[in-house]
Curated annotation (Swiss-Prot):
Molecular function per GO: ATP binding; ATP hydrolysis activity
Compartment(s) of residence: Cell inner membrane
EC top class, as a word: translocase
Protein name per Swiss-Prot or TrEMBL: Galactose/methyl galactoside import ATP-binding protein MglA
Gene this chain is encoded by: mglA
Length: 506
């Protein structure tokens, strides 16, 4: 049975009609609609701020809707809490995993509803029931293991197993593959297929178009809180979906590469990190105006390269030369003073102070430059530089005093890049710069990277998205298990060649 036929034959599980929700000064949802069927995966798409999360929070009992109707299994519902939604068969696998890390896997699975034997918890039954679910979903984790010892992908599987244990009819997945390797993604897709076969309806949120077209049956697009369209995946193109998301035709996914790299600016020779497993004997060159991508599977130690260059990972061997002169970056401060900048992978945990202002987050890497001879801060220069970040990075914000945590992922990333540009770096290193960013904002980040290359910055860009590396970079350095597997020209290589190199030392 094809996905299309299956979707047509399946039962309607959920209907959300004309749902409205307002916050002070903002109409987050304006007559939004969503219909989810059994035996199907339904993508909910839209740029950051389109209303996707708000709509699902109204369903899940986190927010109360202002207007509209929600029908679940044909009956009107208005859940007051997420616990009520769970008990009625609606489960959410959050992007920020919601597990108690210091307890066991099976404790997390049955938290608040332990099986009892008289007045005591029946641990034997809890173990058996957990193992039965894991066997059905092909999850290879010991139910007695502490959650803190699991990988991110294993934690994600536990969240899905928890939904399974509630006998959920609707399972909501928010960016479930953002931290997974290709192998782990394939395992997740197999579990999603099992949920479909069981009769579940899966609501799938992702910015990764390739995934949407691989596993989803239908797509609902929201823009500015409004329902735009619901389409069948088999009858749609990527360009049509993107056009509906952004409200305009996006004629190209990546900006045209017009810059020609110049002379060598950075030489990295025989880098080997102190604490193994890590990078071993890595050498490469970077030219002025060049965008060098770094590819590899999860665990390939891509991030270790930029951390070693930036002075936050100790080396036992290796030389770094800038303009032919050896530089020693023992700390991040030394690296900044030597002309290096690093936009880290985990934006929320290591890139921003989410409860503080855009101004603070724009200036924090360069505070020394705002000191007057009397050791006071020059508020005039601080305000001027913050405004430069907002204007030059095209940050959408009502004020420089707005907390950065209230901005979309794309705007947060622009502030971070702007912050580093204030330090006037010659080498800009970007680790997963578009992770968790919608497709319209991604294009703006790509344009920004191209503009910086035109200004003769040397740029190193790590990404797990192969089309992104091929579309944005000039050359791609491929890592495999901490070793350099090869360097290829982006215009002359393929995903297949890169994957072969990535597996070279496994």
């Amino acid at each position: 049975m094809t996905a299309q036929t299956q979707c047509q034959d399946s039962q309607v599980l959920l209907t959300m009609t004309n749902v409205c929700k307002s916050f002070p000064g903002v109409k987050a949802l304006d007559n939004a609609n969503l219909t989810v069927r059994s035996h199907s995966v339904h993508a909910l798409m839209g740029e950051n701020g389109a209303g996707k999360s708000t709509l699902l929070k109204c369903l899940f009992g986190i927010y109360a809707k202002d207007e509209g109707e929600i029908l679940f299994l044909g009956e009107p519902v208005n859940f007051k809490t997420s616990k009520e939604a769970l008990e009625n068969g609606i489960s959410m696998v959050h992007q920020e995993l919601n597990l108690v890390r210091q307890t066991s896997v099976m404790d997390n699975l049955w938290l608040g509803r332990y099986p009892l034997k008289g007045p005591f918890v029946d641990h034997a039954k809890m173990y058996r029931d957990t193992k039965a679910i894991f066997d059905e979903l092909d999850i290879d984790v010991d139910p007695k293991e502490k959650v803190a010892k699991l990988s991110v992908s294993q934690m994600q599987m536990i969240e899905i197993a928890k939904a399974f244990s509630y006998n959920a009819k609707i399972v909501i997945m928010d960016e479930p593959t953002s931290s997974l390797s290709e192998k782990e993604v394939e395992h997740l897709f197999k579990i999603i297929d099992k949920l479909k076969q069981r009769g579940c309806g899966i609501i799938y949120i992702s910015h990764k178009m390739d995934e949407i077209f691989k596993i989803c049956d239908e797509i609902t697009i929201l823009r500015d809180g409004k329902w735009i369209n619901t389409v069948n995946v088999k009858e749609s193109t990527m360009e049509q979906i993107v056009g509906m998301m952004v409200g305009r035709e996006l004629t190209q996914r990546f900006p045209e590469k017009t810059n020609v790299p110049k002379e060598v600016i950075l030489q990295v020779e025989n880098l080997t990190a102190k604490n193994q497993p890590s990078i071993q004997d890595v050498s490469f060159e970077l030219r002025k105006g060049e965008i060098l991508g770094i590819a590899g599977l999860v665990g390939a130690k891509r991030t270790d390269i930029v951390e070693a260059i930036f002075g936050v990972r100790e080396l036992i061997e290796g030389t770094i030369k800038l303009h032919g002169k050896t530089v020693k970056n023992h700390t991040a401060l030394e690296a900044i003073n030597n002309g290096f900048a690093l936009v880290t992978e985990e934006r929320r945990s290591t890139g921003i102070y989410s409860n503080l202002s855009i101004e603070f987050n724009s200036l924090i890497s360069n505070m020394k430059s705002y000191l007057t001879p009397w050791k006071l801060l020059s508020t005039k220069k601080m305000k001027s530089d913050t405004q430069w970040v907002i204007d030059s990075m095209n940050v959408k914000t009502p004020s420089h005093r707005t907390t950065i945590g209230s901005l979309s992922g794309g705007n947060q990333q622009k502030v971070i890049i702007g912050r580093w540009l204030l330090t006037q770096p010659e080498i800009l290193m970007l680790d997963e710069p578009t992770r968790g960013i919608d497709i319209g904002a991604k294009f703006e980040i790509y344009q920004l990277i191209q503009e910086l290359a035109k200004k003769d910055k040397g740029i190193i860009m790590i990404s797990s998205e192969m089309p992104e590396l091929l579309g944005v970079t000039d050359r791609i350095l491929v890592m495999s298990n901490g070793k350099l597997a090869g360097i290829v020209e982006s215009a002359k290589t393929s995903q297949e060649e890169i994957l072969q190199l990535a597996a070279k030392y496994l």
